[in-house]
Amino acid sequence: MVGKENFKTEDLNLCFEKLMMFGGGSAGAIALGCGKVKMEGRAITDWKDIPMELLLQILGLVDDQTVIMASGVCRGWRDAVCLGLTRLSLSWCTKNMNNLVLSLAPKFTRLQTLILRQDKPQLEDNAVESIANFCHDLQVLDLSKSFKLSDCSLYALAHGCPNLTKLNISGCTAFSDSALEYLASFCQKLKVLNLCGCVRTASDRALLAIGRYCSQLQCLNLGWCEDVSDVGVMSLAYGCPDLRTVDLCGCLQITGALQGNQCCYYQVA
């Protein structure tokens, strides 16, 4: 499985060749030719010879799956990736994403952005709890369509990831409004929050908590959150002075200027 350290030799060679292909264009520091790479007079003929500085530059150019493979090559590469990696997307993983997160979260503790979008729900609470336990610098998290998650995930994020500025839990239908209220009280730096389709989560009670705690909020998606009314939206208006956009598509209880029977993307003046 991707992320394990027991790679075959051909896997390492393939990884090396791919890294060298991408690394060949980096600021003249590398010269490709005759199967060798030179850097500051040093010949690099094998994956073990790549200096850590060069490795980090190259890993910034390749896809996330290759980055994970690279972290399993040897201890030196693992340490370099763990210290240098701040953004990771696992949306390409269509099977076993939950186990992959459980494996990677303890290693990639410097992550600031983590994208875990799914077409078929895979993530479970234990994976999110692992993220919260190890990735305390996380600022951007996408958990959209994580149908299997429960309130336990939001409680864990509240305690482990207080620096979140952007959170996407659209389509996570199992979360309750009390769990979102709890999250808002800890994650007070939130600027972008996507609650589209979170019918149980987005209520006037939850919006009141967001207005009370998340004063830096700028963008909020409440699409198809049918329990939201004027009361909740007004609490946002009073409590979030930086608020710029609110998506109220399908919010049938909204009246007056904000018509809920049609898609409404409200621009705050």
Predicted segment positions?
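CRL adaptor-proximal regions
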Residues: 1-49
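Short hydrophobic alpha-helical "box" of cullin-RING ligase substrate receptors
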Residues: 50-62, 76-77
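Short helix-loop-helix/strand-helix junction enriched in hydrophobic and basic residues
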Residues: 67-83
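F-box-proximal linker/hinge
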Residues: 74, 89-138
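Conserved hydrophobic beta-strand positions in leucine-rich repeat
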Residues: 88-90, 114-117, 141-143, 167-169, ...
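Short, solvent-exposed loop/turn at the beta-strand->alpha-helix junction
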Residues: 94-100, 120-126, 147-152, 173-178, ...
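A structural signal for leucine-rich repeat
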Residues: 102-106, 128-134, 154-160, 180-186, ...
